[in-house]
Amino acid sequence: MAPPKKHRAKIFGGDLETDNDGESAWIVQSCISDGERRWHDTDVQGIRRTLTKLMWNYGDIIVYYHNLKYDLSFLKPVIAIFQDADCEVRATIRRRAPISVRITMDKTHSVTFRDSMKKLPSDLRQVGRMIGLPKLESPRGSFEPGWSKDLDLSKDSDDWTYIDRDADIVAVAMLQLHKSGRTASTASGDAWQWAKRMIGVNPKTGKYNPHDKKWDSLFPHLDVELDRFLRHGYAGGLNISFHTGYSMATPERPITHEDVHNMYGSVLMWDPLPIGIPTESDKWPCDDFLFVAHVSIKLSIKDGMIPWFQFKEGVDNMIEGWPHGTIVECTYHWHEMILTSVDLITLSHFYDIEFCEDFVPHFWIFKQREGIFKEYLEYWTAVKESSEKGTLEYTSAKLMINSLYGRFALAPETEENKLEYCEDLGDWDWISEDTLNEESDAYLPYAMFITAYARARLLENVMAVGCDNVIHCDTDSVIHFGPPSEDVEHGEHLGTWGIESEPVAIYEGGFKRYIEVLRYPIESPKDIAMACAGVPQKFDPTGKVPVGMWVELLDDPARICETGRTLGQADYRIGSEWLRRIYIENGYDPDHVNTNKLIPETVPGGTILRERQHCLNDMMIYRFRR
């Protein structure tokens, strides 16, 4: 498959080192690298001069920062200088998360800031490993406020070595992706470009036809009002939690953790999915049609089944007098719902559905087709399988497989962002104004049915292993008592189930949190597998010593079952023998461990990281328990 046309812009990696006094923050060092040469600055005006020079030398340039949201908070004054000089500034920011900021001097000279984490969502240490360019350790340890007061900022100082390496890693990684044709701002954008190009290839000549209308006929532009209405029926993955507390595996009742090999990719490959402009009707479609229904229903859980459905809209919970996020067992009032035909079938397996006779249902009926992206998936699967695990090519190919479906659900609502000086903040800030992208090329029904099939496939395994045996489910995995079921397909290829682990015990905590004990006695973090939303799982630079908030859970796994427990201490004492041993052997003090997590806070001049605690919570006040 020929890659999309390469972007002509010159690619750079950038990094900032910053300091703060607890109330305000400032730039200490700036490095912009093309992987071979580096440009150093120590203030806003210096960065502005460097960017101007690079634009005049190369025309259009793209500078990637790893975690642009953080760095952009310091670069706002630089952007403001260009803006005041009548340069055009266009910022793409979604939900306060910047995707890109483009500064245009004239038709042939521009700089675009992008976030390399949007293309490789890994920390910089992992990215360095992917390209064989290890991240260096800071010679100054942690960056406490005032850390830079003795820094040597002279041209040939060794104090530039650390930031140079970080900028080099970003530059080399992004340049490799651009050279291979992955030139969009995000991984999903890369996938979208490649998929559209693949659809436009002439099967006879094998060449891409930029004027081909096949994509538009398959995924036509939908009216914004229809998109908004159907969006009420778009939902993501499921999370189910039962048997909370500690459970031990036995020979008679083992514990099995199963995962699907690429859930969404398998749906794209094998399942019939909607295409084209839907036909509207008030009559129930035939069973073999794909449709979206607007219906009014009541639900009641069937005997022997587990409840899993949640209302997406807060008003539905209010009607029942429930907190938002409640798992539905039985409803006592009618609810107008937007549901795909796949979801209606899945619901009918677990719930008795009563339809309101006084409500006239409405349906959007779609044509359907399977395997539209078969060639795309096979291509990137082959790239992944031919690449060494952990390399940039392997990681990026995996992202190309997994990132395509979500782009279909991109909302037409967007933002116009202007950089203005706010007197109240004493700093520059982005002022957002909601607007509509009337020409959006997203096609929401495709994403609606992809996630609906994924939920159905997950619940198919739930029924196969027995509802009473289910411990935890999350999007594409099921943890349960007992062996794998022979009623679902197991294997190594796309869409089959595989054994992730067979733990000897599990601590089931609730919504997106559990700890599996893979073997006793516990002697290292490798003997444990953990999932806990909101709790970072970090190691020290050696990769041997766990640090931060999850230390409290490793130290006593039973804590993950304590809903409402607060994690995070400035001076935590480790109690478990195995974890104390690891700390002592690696030169750390197990009696004085900071387990707080760092949360960014915007201050005048930029961003500082504040220590914060975390409460273990199901993100719902009520959760069905057995």
Could you say what each language-model-derived stretch is?
Residues 2-11, 22-27, 31-67, 72-626:
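Conserved acidic
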